[in-house]
Amino acid sequence: MPIPLHEVRERTFAGTRRRIFQLLVDMGTSNDVIWPFAAQPFMRSPGPLIPGKTEEWHNGFHAVLEEVAPEERIVWRIQNEGFEGTHGFYLSGDAKKTTVEHRIDATLSDTEGRLLWRRLEDANERSMEALFDKIARVLKR
């Protein structure tokens, strides 16, 4: 039986949506200053973010960009076997504070999806917390 997965992590930062959105856009490129684990790289295809074309790879996940709305959200369609859904960054806030929410909304298949999530769940939690910590440090510069 398929299992729904809804994971949300968020943090509020002292920074503008414009600045934080650009940091997220640069993740996985040569301009990346926020991905926290050099030994576990975040990679994405070169060039601008283009829905349906831009791909990303990290922590065992492969995804294709589904939607990008400047200063609001970046949403990726997960391509892994057993995962049907998305993960993305959603930004909200005012001129001085921005909340970044990372969401995974997916349906896991009985076997492949559950096993993959069990293997990646801890890495996802550590990565998101470390990513948020790194964003906070970069914004203080």
Which residues fall in each region the model found?
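Beta-strand/loop substructures that line and gate deep hydrophobic ligand-binding cavities in soluble
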Residues: 79-130
